[in-house]
């Protein structure tokens, strides 16, 4: 019984993944998912209360992992003594982005759902929310540098948002455009070098 139950659940999730990837959450048909899974509507509702509950079951583990590791990286850095933060800046950022690239490459399809197919769900602003966190911690770090006597030019929150948004969306292109895993780390490493040089220029370094 348990084996049959697990098989039914897997069939529903596999059919849903294909349907959501093809049509997005809003365009996906619950009837088509049930049909493609080869189960009854009653069997479906034995596992999920709605189409959104099904989408959440597929996406949430990955959204949670990406956001929690991202927040951990931000708070770990911010909790360092201020005088130690500058020397850790590049290392912390590179390590986290390298982990993120590996993770999204290992979980391409559900991550692609999260990034490309979530309109109409609570996940549709996922990248925007990450960007807002990045902006907040960037502005805090600028404050740290100023307190240390660095002459950091004033930069608007909107500019910081544009820069951070460009960076995150560029990293996620790895999944959106099915970049080969062998190529992704190198491309993202060069992307980081590009953004690091830009930030250095803006900060007068």
Report residues per predicted region:
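Amphipathic alpha-helical packing segments from all-alpha helical-bundle domains
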Residues: 91, 99-103, 121-147, 158-165
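Helix-turn-helix
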Residues: 11, 15, 19-53, 57
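N-terminal intrinsically disordered/low-complexity leader segments
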Residues: 1-4
């Amino acid at each position: 019984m348990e084996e049959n139950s697990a098989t039914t659940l897997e069939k529903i999730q596999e059919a849903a993944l294909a349907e959501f990837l093809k049509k997005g959450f809003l365009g996906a048909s619950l009837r088509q998912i049930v049909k493609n899974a080869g189960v009854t509507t009653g069997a479906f509702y034995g596992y999920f209360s709605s189409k959104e509950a099904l989408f959440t079951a597929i996406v949430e583990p990955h959204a949670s992992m990406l956001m929690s590791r991202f927040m951990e990286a931000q708070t770990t850095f911010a909790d360092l003594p201020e005088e130690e933060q500058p020397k850790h800046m590049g290392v912390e950022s590179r390590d986290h982005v390298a982990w993120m690239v590996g993770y999204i490459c290992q979980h391409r399809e559900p991550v692609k759902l999260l990034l490309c197919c979530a309109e109409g769900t609570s996940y549709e602003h996922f990248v925007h929310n990450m960007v807002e966190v990045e902006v907040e911690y960037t502005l805090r770090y600028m404050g740290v540098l100023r307190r240390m006597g660095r002459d950091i030019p004033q930069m608007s929150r909107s500019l910081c948002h544009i820069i951070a948004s460009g960076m995150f969306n560029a990293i996620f292109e790895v999944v959106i455009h099915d970049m080969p895993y062998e190529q992704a780390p190198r491309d993202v490493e060069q992307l980081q070098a590009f953004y690091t040089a830009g930030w250095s220029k803006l900060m007068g370094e």
